[in-house]
Amino acid sequence: MSKSALDPVEFLKGALEIPSPSGKERLVAEYLAEGMQKLGLKGFVDEADNARGQVGEGPVQVVLLGHIDTVPGQIPVRLEGGRLFGRGAVDAKGPFVAMIFAAAGLSEEARKRLTVHLVGATEEEAPSSKGARFVAPRLKPHYAVIGEPSG
């Protein structure tokens, strides 16, 4: 599938349709990793069930981290008036999907200067923070962006 064949709204809608309460993120992680691969990124699921991606081969390390778990409960997924609704649309599958598409759009020049690591972390909504704790000792970025909404 070409980069242009993966629609960001449809991709996010698909992620929202996969329930992923804390501790049960594996299916959405696999979906996101597959999407990253379709966009030309190295996409995979790690031992903590984080959805992970990487692009670029440069010396400057950047982490783009969002979480892919949600609080329990269902919100019907719907597109209404140009807005997408569903559990995780804002907190925080939406920000992570935006990060995926931003990374996929990096220029060749940027890919030579940067290595961008994408982390769709598990269990952020739980006290364990399993996903972030797993990657913290493994990634030593120069810069990090956390895709977490604020009140």
Residue ranges with predicted function:
Residues 1, 14, 60-65, 93-98, ...:
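Phosphate-binding glycine-rich loops and adjacent basic patches that engage nucleotide phosphates
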Residues 1-89, 111:
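Acidic/His- and Gly-rich active-site-bordering loop/insert found
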Residues 28, 76, 95, 128-131:
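Residues at alpha-helix caps and immediate loop-helix transition turns in enzyme cores, especially N-
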Residues 68-70, 92, 124-125, 149:
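Generic detector of well-ordered alpha-helical packing
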Residues 86-97, 122:
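Short, conserved micro-motifs enriched in small and acidic residues
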Residues 97-151:
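Acidic/histidine-rich catalytic neighborhood of metal-dependent amide-processing enzymes
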